[in-house]
């Protein structure tokens, strides 16, 4: 990563000047067939169209220059080769590599060295152990419940949803994440415990929400006369309190160098996906992700899909100053994907301190959000078209549906109607529509991109997952921040434990005692807090 500040880069100054009068997408003839063909990229079964972004050749050249100045490619190579990228200079930090790409590098025989080679070999061993476990136990259970929170739930849940439409399965899958006991109670009402496998996922083995939910499940199983060890397995770091094969039926491993939000291609996602859809489906997902890892190493930005998309996002965020980005998938299989991206993007790049340890004076991660199309067209798209804030949109679509069932009505199939809506929204946002009635006038110039593949499969889902991982990481490299820690999450955990001690009549800690006691007193006028949650 370049030691110079993002703001001090010469390309930044060029882009600031260009942003004063960016291309007007509403001008007649601007969005031409030639522009649409030139501003597109074909890679790993995806077509990426950025003709509806407010960029031209000059802006793209300056963005390429900025990516070069900020050392994006070198930083990506360093990350994938296992160099330490999770650090803050001159201050205590995690100071370790970020090796999520190593969890899938082995499936394509990607050559690695040092830490990356070690984690790749270990990942291959864990996958082989998973294969053996599935061969032995998969037929013994009809249901799997994954207990975990954050990256131990959001990514695997998004992938499960993506695969269930294309991979036949007779298995039932549930996720329990929230410490709200109603989350666990709802699942327990649905399952036959005697035929259920529970996988508890926690890197540290001490995650509060996960430990509480596991205990709740264990108590329920015990009351039904079922052995904990016969039904519970774990995914955790070696040496954690959960790394205990005398307690669990099996323990699979993950490593500190793999962040939770980037862990879906490790055993964090592998166990539940392998159980639900079979070992081969998980391998295909790994192959797609590994293929996109190689794309992220392409030297030219025009051929490097994650880098190109990352720099378009930098343009929208830092130069056109758009505060949020919407991700709108036109596929039921991606129902939970925006929630995963929200964590991946905002937990990674929601930072205001540079890796140098200095405060930064520019915007970092936009607010990431989204919902399925066409549903979202009938909820918040009004604001996208005519709201006071311009929101760049990233559309994701597929030419064919997953399940193969469709019907033709009025000359077109449902899949064609879905795809037509996505294309129409992109055009409408860019071009707008003039009307003398101001309430019916659409100004346009609202940027978007289109990412399209033929069909959502395990392979394309793996590639899509890795595409967004690398896009987010490239942006962190460009901003000069550490995309791999999450001190804000740690702070909340620490203070919650202090508040709990106060609720239990113990010393809570100087950080929160006055505020917590006042707030707890406000909510405790009629009922003792220790009775909360009881019938």
Swiss-Prot record:
Keyword annotations from UniProtKB, A to Z: Cytoplasm, Gluconeogenesis, Glycolysis, Isomerase
Protein name: Glucose-6-phosphate isomerase
GO molecular function annotation: carbohydrate derivative binding; glucose-6-phosphate isomerase activity; monosaccharide binding
Enzyme class at the top of the EC tree: isomerase
Gene3D superfamilies the UniProt entry points to: 1.10.1390.10, Glucose-6-phosphate isomerase like protein, domain 1
SUPFAM superfamilies noted in UniProt: SIS domain (SSF53697)
Major place of residence: cytoplasm
EC numbers on record: 5.3.1.9
Species of provenance: Chlamydia felis (strain Fe/C-56) (Chlamydophila felis)
Membrane-spanning segments: none
Annotated InterPro entries: G6P_Isomerase, G6P_Isomerase_C, Phosphoglucose_isomerase_CS, SIS_dom_sf, SIS_PGI_1, SIS_PGI_2
Gene that this polypeptide is encoded by: pgi
Pathway(s) of this molecule: Carbohydrate biosynthesis; gluconeogenesis; Carbohydrate degradation; glycolysis; D-glyceraldehyde 3-phosphate and glycerone phosphate from D-glucose: step 2/4
Biological process annotations from GO: gluconeogenesis; glucose 6-phosphate metabolic process; glycolytic process
Described purpose of this protein according to its UniProt entry: Catalyzes the reversible isomerization of glucose-6-phosphate to fructose-6-phosphate.
Highest rank taxon of the organism: Bacteria
Compartment(s) of residence: Cytoplasm
Reaction(s) catalysed (UniProt annotation): alpha-D-glucose 6-phosphate = beta-D-fructose 6-phosphate
Gene Ontology CC annotation, any one: cytosol
């Amino acid at each position: 990563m370049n030691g110079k500040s993002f703001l001090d880069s010469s390309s930044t100054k060029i882009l600031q000047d260009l942003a004063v009068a960016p291309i007007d997408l509403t001008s007649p003839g601007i969005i031409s067939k030639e522009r649409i063909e030139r501003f597109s990229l074909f890679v790993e079964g995806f077509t990426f169209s950025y003709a509806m972004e407010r960029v031209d050749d000059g802006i793209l050249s300056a963005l390429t220059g900025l990516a070069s100045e900020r050392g994006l490619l070198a930083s990506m190579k360093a990350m994938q080769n296992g160099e330490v990228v999770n650090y803050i200079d001159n201050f205590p930090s995690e100071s370790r590599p970020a090796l999520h790409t190593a969890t899938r590098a082995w499936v394509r025989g990607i050559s690695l060295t040092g830490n990356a080679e070690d984690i790749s070999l270990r990942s291959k061993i864990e996958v082989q152990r998973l294969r053996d476990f599935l061969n032995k136990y998969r037929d013994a259970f009809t249901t799997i419940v994954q207990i975990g929170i954050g990256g131990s739930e959001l990514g695997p849940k998004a992938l499960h949803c993506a695969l269930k439409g294309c991979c036949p399965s007779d298995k039932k899958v549930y996720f329990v994440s929230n410490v709200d006991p109603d989350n666990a109670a709802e699942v327990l009402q649905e399952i036959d415990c005697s035929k259920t496998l529970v996988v508890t996922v926690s890197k540290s083995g001490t995650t509060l929400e996960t430990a509480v939910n596991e205990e709740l499940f264990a108590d329920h199983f015990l009351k039904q006369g079922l052995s904990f060890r016969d039904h519970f397995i774990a995914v955790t770091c070696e040496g954690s309190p959960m790394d205990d094969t005398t307690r669990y039926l099996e323990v699979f491993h993950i490593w500190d160098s793999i962040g939770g939000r980037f862990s879906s291609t490790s055993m964090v996602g592998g166990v539940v996906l392998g159980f639900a859809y079979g070992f081969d489906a998980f391998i295909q997902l790994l192959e797609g992700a590994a293929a996109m890892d190689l794309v992220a190493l392409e030297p030219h930005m025009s051929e490097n899909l994650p880098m190109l998309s990352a720099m378009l996002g930098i343009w929208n965020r830092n130069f056109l100053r758009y505060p949020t980005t919407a991700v709108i998938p036109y596929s039921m299989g991606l129902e939970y994907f925006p929630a995963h991206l929200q964590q991946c993007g905002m937990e990674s790049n929601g930072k205001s301190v540079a890796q140098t340890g200095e405060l930064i004076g520019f915007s970092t991660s936009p607010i990431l959000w989204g919902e399925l199309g066409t549903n979202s067209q009938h909820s918040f798209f009004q604001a996208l078209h005519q709201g006071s804030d311009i929101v760049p949109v990233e559309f994701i679509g597929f030419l064919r549906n997953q399940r193969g069932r469709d019907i033709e009505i009025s000359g077109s199939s449902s899949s064609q109607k879905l795809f037509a809506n996505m294309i129409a929204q992109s055009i409408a946002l860019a071009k707008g529509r003039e009307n003398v009635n101001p309430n019916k006038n659409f100004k346009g110039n609202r940027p978007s991109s289109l990412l399209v593949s033929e069909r959502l499969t395990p392979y394309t889902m793996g590639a899509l997952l890795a595409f967004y991982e690398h896009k987010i990481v490239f942006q962190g490299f460009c901003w000069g921040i550490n995309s791999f820690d999450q001190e804000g999450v740690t702070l909340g955990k620490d203070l919650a434990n202090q508040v709990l001690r106060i609720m239990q009549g113990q010393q809570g800690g100087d950080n929160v005692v006055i505020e917590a006691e006042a707030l707890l007193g406000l909510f405790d006028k009629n009922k003792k807090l220790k009775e909360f949650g009881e019938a």
